[in-house]
């Protein structure tokens, strides 16, 4: 759900706005829980629920901006994540079952997954392991013969040029469109919970990475573009 990546002040802001619209025991409790929380405390279940809902709303905002209908957006809520702490539970059969279910329902021709193994608190790695385990279980299904899996990099490191198997050129307008979509994830900008060693904003890192990839292709004698998104194919 991404709930632990939402800062307390962001959750408090939402709870106070909701409470000001009409008294609610739930939001009153959330405001109290956040106010009484110490640096050694974990979030209460109500606070975690609010933070997870905030992340969902931000994602829906971004996908709407990109023109994706709400009924085509699915949230997995993998159980391994829901500990309320940075340390997660081990990946379990229930996580794989959820991943299997969404793939079997949609029967996708392409799957795009974050290959950010440099993610400071490892969530992307675990999600990727869940996908790989699911692919291993489903690979003999007839519909999987037409499915390709592409891995991209996010806010951290880009693929090396010799690893890239698909590069998608981007115009200046597309770069700006991607930036605006990232901005919908309001709680993940302006000093986030898990920044890593790079202090640049996530959207700045993403743009710099895309522009640098385009420059590398230009130096190889290929066409010049504003930016390029790079992918590596995962064979299963």
Q: What is each model feature region?
A:
Residues 1-145, 183-184, 198-205, 212-219, ...:
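Active-site beta-strand->loop->alpha-helix modules in alpha/beta enzyme cores, enriched
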Residues 73-75, 149-151, 167:
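Conserved beta-strand scaffold positions in the cores of enzyme catalytic domains, especially
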Residues 77-79, 153-155, 171:
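Residues at the C-termini of beta-strands that transition into short coil/loop
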Residues 136-164:
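Short, flexible loop segments at boundaries between secondary-structure elements
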Residues 158-216:
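A conserved mid-domain beta-alpha-beta active-site/ligand-binding segment of alpha/beta enzyme cores
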Residues 234-236:
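C-terminal accessory region of SF2 helicases/translocases
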């Amino acid at each position: 759900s991404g709930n632990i990546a939402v800062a307390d002040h962001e959750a408090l802001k939402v709870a106070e706005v909701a409470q000001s619209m009409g008294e609610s025991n739930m939001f009153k409790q959330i405001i109290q829980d956040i106010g009484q929380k110490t640096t050694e405390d974990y979030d209460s279940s109500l606070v975690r629920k609010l933070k997870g809902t905030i992340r969902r709303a931000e994602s829906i905002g971004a996908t709407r901006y990109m023109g994706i209908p709400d009924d085509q957006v699915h949230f997995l809520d993998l159980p391994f994540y829901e500990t309320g702490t940075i340390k997660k539970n081990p990946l379990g059969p229930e996580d794989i079952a959820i991943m299997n279910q969404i793939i079997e329902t949609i029967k996708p021709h392409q799957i795009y997954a974050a290959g950010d193994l440099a993610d400071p608190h490892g969530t992307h790695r675990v999600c990727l392991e869940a996908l790989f385990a699911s692919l291993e279980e489903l690979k003999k299904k007839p519909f999987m013969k037409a499915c390709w899996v592409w891995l991209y990099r996010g806010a951290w490191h880009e693929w090396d040029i010799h690893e890239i198997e698909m590069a998608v050129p981007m115009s200046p307008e597309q770069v700006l469109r991607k930036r605006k979509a990232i901005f919908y994830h309001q709680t993940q900008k302006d000093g986030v919970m898990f920044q890593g060693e790079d202090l640049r904003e996530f959207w700045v890192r993403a743009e710099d990475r895309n522009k640098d990839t385009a420059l590398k292709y230009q130096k190889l004698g290929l066409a010049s573009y504003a930016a390029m998104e790079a992918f590596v194919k995962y064979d299963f």
